[in-house]
């Protein structure tokens, strides 16, 4: 308990930011302005550090210019481009410094704790029988139609809940596999929390988030356990746990399996309609896009919050080929060999999260939805990976 109180005392500001950001996950419970307070707190913290413009990362400036070019040409009068620009300024690696980089790592460390807390909140909601997907969003249970309800707990959307649980899986895989942790009960706690995160991810019914989390957890085992004996030990442990818990997890995965069966029967995925919309928007304005935060074409065009179905298609539709090519270049520049950032084991975890965002952004709007807390975390992750390479000679 004393260690926990000491940690809170030393990290209270970062924990406050984490709370503000994660309030966005529970939009039925907390007012939306709390999330924006979190962004303002990060901006305030940035002013306390010495930062400079990094010329080698000028591509981010071009990305911002592409967004504003599309916004101005299409006469999109909305505050969202301003919000997104501010997020990139505080999070992306084109205005930064060594100490600001270290602070962003500290903030991400607390954000990972936030993901762990979402799993606990989801378990409490499950125990209490709370599922806002049914009671608040849909208004009725899908069991009335012979289906199984997706679980969101106190969160607004099951997908948001599942993505948070998937990141929590990565976090506890990292804590379990890293060198230096020898206490038996601590390792048992990590295993329990990993399995709890897996359970929440499964009942929230996102196949892609769950599959990616499992693959990257195995990758973390490989990256953090170079010793063959240690690697074998964990394979055996999780093999036994997997065999014993298989019936329980399969029973919990009913909704996930139903979605897979429906896709196989119809040949239609849950993203097809959204992807068709994005492509229609792209075809209507292929060079510079339809404008930031714009959905639809012609008389059906709206400005505001909407489900994009894919970060990359949203960028293509809203900023056209110009913005898409720039985004692709800056994202590819982030990839690195693990040895370039391995001087700090936490960089390995953050790189695993970057890979999660890389793949899952094909299906979700992490990169391009400034009103979603995952957008801030996504760009913080990109920045820390990029800066870890850039400042290696100072920190290794």
Predicted regions and their residues:
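Transmembrane alpha-helical segments and their membrane-water interfaces
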Residues: 41-49, 71-126, 217-224, 331, ...
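Transmembrane alpha-helices of multi-pass inner-membrane enzymes
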Residues: 39-42, 350-360, 367-396
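Hydrophobic transmembrane alpha-helices and their immediate junctions
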Residues: 46-51, 55-57, 218, 222, ...
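A membrane-periplasm/extracellular boundary helix in multi-pass inner-membrane enzymes
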Residues: 73, 124-129, 224-262, 279-284
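Transmembrane signal-anchor hairpin modules in multi-pass inner-membrane enzymes, especially those
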Residues: 1-73, 101-103, 109, 178-186, ...
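Helix-loop-helix junctions and helix-breaking kinks within/between transmembrane helices
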Residues: 23-35, 76-84, 157-162, 189-221, ...
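Long extracytoplasmic/lumenal interhelical loops at the membrane interface
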Residues: 260-319
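Alpha-helical transmembrane segments of multi-pass inner-membrane proteins
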Residues: 108-136, 156-223
């Amino acid at each position: 308990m004393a260690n926990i109180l000491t940690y809170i005392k030393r990290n209270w500001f970062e924990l406050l930011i984490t709370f503000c950001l994660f309030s966005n996950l529970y939009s039925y419970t907390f007012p939306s302005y709390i999330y924006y307070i979190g962004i303002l707190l990060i901006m305030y913290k940035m002013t306390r550090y010495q930062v400079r413009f990094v010329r080698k990362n000028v591509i981010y400036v071009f990305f911002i210019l592409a967004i504003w070019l599309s916004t101005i040409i299409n006469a999109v009068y909305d505050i969202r481009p301003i919000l997104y620009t501010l997020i990139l300024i505080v999070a992306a690696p084109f205005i930064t410094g060594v100490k600001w980089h270290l602070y962003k790592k500290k903030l991400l460390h607390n954000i990972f704790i936030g993901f762990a807390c979402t799993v606990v909140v989801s378990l409490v909601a499950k125990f209490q029988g709370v599922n806002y997907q049914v009671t608040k969003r849909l208004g009725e249970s899908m069991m009335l139609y012979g289906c199984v309800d997706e679980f969101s707990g106190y969160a607004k959307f099951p997908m948001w809940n599942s993505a948070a649980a998937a990141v929590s899986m990565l976090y506890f895989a990292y804590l379990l596999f890293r060198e230096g942790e020898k206490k038996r009960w601590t390792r048992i706690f990590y295993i329990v929390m990993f399995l709890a995160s897996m359970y929440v991810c499964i009942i929230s019914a996102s196949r892609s988030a769950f599959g990616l989390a499992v693959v990257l957890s195995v990758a973390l085992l490989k990256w953090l356990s170079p010793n063959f004996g240690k690697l074998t030990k964990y394979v055996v442990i999780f093999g036994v746990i997997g065999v014993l818990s298989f019936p329980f997890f399969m029973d919990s995965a009913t909704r996930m399996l139903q979605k897979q069966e429906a896709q196989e029967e119809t040949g239609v995925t849950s993203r097809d309609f959204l992807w068709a919309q994005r492509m229609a928007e792209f075809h209507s304005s292929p060079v510079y896009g339809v404008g930031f935060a714009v959905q639809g074409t012609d008389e059906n065009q709206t400005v505001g919050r909407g489900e994009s179905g894919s970060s990359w298609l949203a960028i293509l539709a809203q900023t056209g080929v110009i913005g898409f090519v720039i985004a692709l270049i800056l994202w590819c520049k982030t990839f690195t060999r693990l040895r370039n950032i391995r001087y700090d084991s936490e960089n390995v975890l953050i790189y695993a999260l970057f890979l999660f965002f890389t793949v899952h952004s094909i299906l979700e709007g992490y990169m391009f939805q400034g009103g979603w807390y995952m957008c801030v975390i996504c760009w913080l992750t990109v920045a820390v990976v990029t800066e870890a390479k850039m400042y290696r000679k100072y920190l290794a």
